[in-house]
Amino acid sequence: MLSGVWFLSVLTVAGILQTESRKTAKDICKIRCLCEEKENVLNINCENKGFTTVSLLQPPQYRIYQLFLNGNLLTRLYPNEFVNYSNAVTLHLGNNGLQEIRTGAFSGLKTLKRLHLNNNKLEILREDTFLGLESLEYLQADYNYISAIEAGAFSKLNKLKVLILNDNLLLSLPSNVFRFVLLTHLDLRGNRLKVMPFAGVLEHIGGIMEIQLEENPWNCTCDLLPLKAWLDTITVFVGEIVCETPFRLHGKDVTQLTRQDLCPRKSASDSSQRGSHADTHVQRLSPTMNPALNPTRAPKASRPPKMRNRPTPRVTVSKDRQSFGPIMVYQTKSPVPLTCPSSCVCTSQSSDNGLNVNCQERKFTNISDLQPKPTSPKKLYLTGNYLQTVYKNDLLEYSSLDLLHLGNNRIAVIQEGAFTNLTSLRRLYLNGNYLEVLYPSMFDGLQSLQYLYLEYNVIKEIKPLTFDALINLQLLFLNNNLLRSLPDNIFGGTALTRLNLRNNHFSHLPVKGVLDQLPAFIQIDLQENPWDCTCDIMGLKDWTEHANSPVIINEVTCESPAKHAGEILKFLGREAICPDSPNLSDGTVLSMNHNTDTPRSLSVSPSSYPELHTEVPLSVLILGLLVVFILSVCFGAGLFVFVLKRRKGVPSVPRNTNNLDVSSFQLQYGSYNTETHDKTDGHVYNYIPPPVGQMCQNPIYMQKEGDPVAYYRNLQEFSYSNLEEKKEEPATPAYTISATELLEKQATPREPELLYQNIAERVKELPSAGLVHYNFCTLPKRQFAPSYESRRQNQDRINKTVLYGTPRKCFVGQSKPNHPLLQAKPQSEPDYLEVLEKQTAISQL
């Protein structure tokens, strides 16, 4: 009962706390800030509220949210300033006049993914500036006064992918500044960079997808060779890198220069001549040169438009240079009055390059709100506004645009023909919006478009022929959307070199009509998709493996079925992916036809099978030989053990005569039939030991107490039982039989051992035979052994033996014995010495 009451009280308190939390969050949204829920994320808009510290704001504790603090008075961020903001995923601190961020200011923001510090007065990024932001993926710090970055400033931001540092005062980058981050986008435009080394900087951004280096005073000398070499090896979007110095390369694009242009090999004879010629040019130009040619930045407190009057590329025809001199080379167009929309910042490189209009985060809801219209805009940045629809007439007066940035808005609708007038547009950013469907008329008029960014939308469908009008399209980012499939021939009319399909919902991707339409040497990112590694993915596997150049940026990782989850597609065998299908090695193989002027086409051609190589790899050969050797050793060892066991299975007689047990032997009769055995050195015939104990009931084997000699003297007869008589007796499990046979004296004298030498060859078949069973006894161990001389003296007197053996079957003839000793009892009793001599002689046989 008490436990139930306790449980109810706990639930009540939890409910009250949750209600209070909701009430507090509601009060914040109602009184201090404007709150709006979008995509299950709460947007807390606290812009221009005059906050001097964020400790005055109490955020909700049980919901994730985006916090907008733009346009406040947060000039300094103190330690633990955001300790209560653990559920914030996005934090906007732009236009606050922020000058200092102290150590631990961002502690508590463990889930923060995007941080915006743009349009402030920061001068340095220290190693401890971003402590606590382990989950940060997007950092925007453009339009500040940043002139120095410490080497470990980004070392804790292991998940950082996008870094925006454009329009600052950076002279150089410290070594290993990007060592611990995996950047995909880096913006360094509008700084004061002259060189960029490979060691310590470029070597750590190998996974970069976009790097912008425009509007820097690049020093195109031998020091720029590492950057030039790096640019020649990548295919990512870089932007225009224009030389500022030396004089001879002023205004040239670095990507169009050769190594000889950057670092010429001058001989001693003409080096002085070229030097004096260059000095003459400089002296002639100096009186008339506009100071604006030297890129400088006005004090950023007032933030006036940045003027970078970069000269137009000079004429390369030597005749013109000699006729008109350098004044003609650097002559620019007549000044044109520049107009800039209110609430925007406009900069210009030169009158012929147009105007850069920066209207980021100005709360515009429509593009038509930009008044007055800018004059000849070259680049228009409308990032981070509240645009929801791009109307058909919004961009009619922006035909000179080269770049249009509409990212991070709320655009869900683009009316048909909205971009028709943008015939010169090369870069279009539509990332971070709410687009769901792409259709062909959406991109009408963009025949010059080269770079299209559509990542981080909610795109679920792309209509056929959507990109057909984009004949110059080179880069297409569709990552982080909801795509499950692509229509046939979707990329047929493009010239793509970079395609990003990362983090969508693709389980399969057909080759025919999709991948086979991609041009040569394309880089494609297919990672973070739920790939289903079954038979349907074999086309994609073949396409990736038969490509002539490495086109896959990241590996294709299987998500299903469960047995292949987490495995890389290219490491899976065909049988593992599709075990029930026929052998695919004899099936369809993708053939690739390359042409320098035409896109690569992947076609299915039965006659264009790849050449089959029958050579066995060395590693496989060595492994096979090793297996054969091991099997041979095992087989030989088994055969040896088998033979050894067979040999041990043959019975043998011990060689030690003192420990010999009588086993079996055969006695030669006049007529006999018996089994044969090989004679050994320790055969039983060498000697017959005295009997040991009473082993059977036959009297002849019964040893009586007292003198054993008297026993032999009283022995009256030998017992013999014929087969016929045995038949009359009742059957018993065992019975005893003894036999005595006198050995006839040999016709010729010979050794006793020769008696049984060829006994195996003298087998004769008896006329009739009967089956007789024998039970024998083991004789006692003899107490002494006579000498050899004694045995020799009594050898001729041996005339009988006693047969002992193990139980065995044999055939005994029923013929009547002829020896007188077998017909009656002995005529006389044996003498003791005679018995002893006989026993001694027999024991030596």
Curated annotation (Swiss-Prot):
Tissue-wise expression: Expressed predominantly in the cerebral cortex of the brain but also at low levels in the spinal cord and medulla. Also expressed in some astrocytic brain tumors such as astrocytomas, oligodendrogliomas, glioblastomas, gangliogliomas and primitive neuroectodermal tumors.
Effect annotated for changing R792C: Found in a patient with a neurodevelopmental disorder; uncertain significance; does not affect surface expression; does not affect localization to dendrites; does not affect function in synaptogenesis; able to rescue defects of excitatory synapse development and synaptic transmission when expressed in SLITRK2 knockout-out mouse hippocampal neurons
Localization per Swiss-Prot or TrEMBL: Membrane; Cell membrane; Cell projection, Dendrite
Chain positions found as Phosphotyrosine: Y756
Any Pfam family matching the protein: LRR_8
Ranges of the Extracellular topological domain: 22-621
Annotated consequence of substituting V89M: Found in a patient with schizophrenia; uncertain significance; does not impair synaptogenesis; no effect on localization to cell membrane
Function comment: It is involved in synaptogenesis and promotes excitatory synapse differentiation. Suppresses neurite outgrowth. Involved in the negative regulation of NTRK2.
Record protein name field: SLIT and NTRK-like protein 2
